Amino acid sequence: DRLNLALGLNASEDHFNSVAWNEEGASVGDAMNYYSPLCPVTNSDGSWYKDLTISQNYNPLSMINEDKMNNQHHRLMFTTKAEFKIMTGLTWTANYSYSNSQNIYNYSNSVNSQTDVRNGAASRSIYQGHKQVFETFGNFLKTFNKVHTLSLMGGYSWEEEHSGDGFGAKVFNFYNDQVGYNNLAYANFIKSVDG
């Protein structure tokens, strides 16, 4: 009766597949607004139509079929609470929580992509972080003469957060579209590695 314990565990994993949502008009949403319905979708040979006289005039169907994005988010959270009644009116409480997250971002542009004309492009990056919080406090409550109440509280709190730890690579110039972002080593050119 004097000790109360509580534990909690929450885990989630999300997968998100989408088309590219790039900046400066190079997203499917933008292209659906500005691409003229009078322009053909494909050329007579089956390739995607592109009007070379207008800059940043991307064919939205080409973008849907040639530019891919896949993201994954993993999250884990653990919480615990202990409350101890030392005596009437005096309790001591301790809380601890830990959360961990990992985000994986992948995208690829095929060799036929209109948004990236470097014979295919791919990128993979992963970022992770964690956070810990510990707090402990005591409460004292005393009523005098059924009229006056004295309430005191004292405690300590500590927090640690580490985020943005990760790396990524961007590559270009593939022989074909078979590997996409799954094996960046097959590209002929590495633009950057971030860490």
Regions found by a protein language model. Name each.
Residues 1-77, 93-195:
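Surface-exposed loop/interface segments of Gram-negative outer-membrane beta-barrel transport/assembly proteins
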Residues 85-94:
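A conserved hydrophobic secondary-structure block that centers on an alpha-helix together
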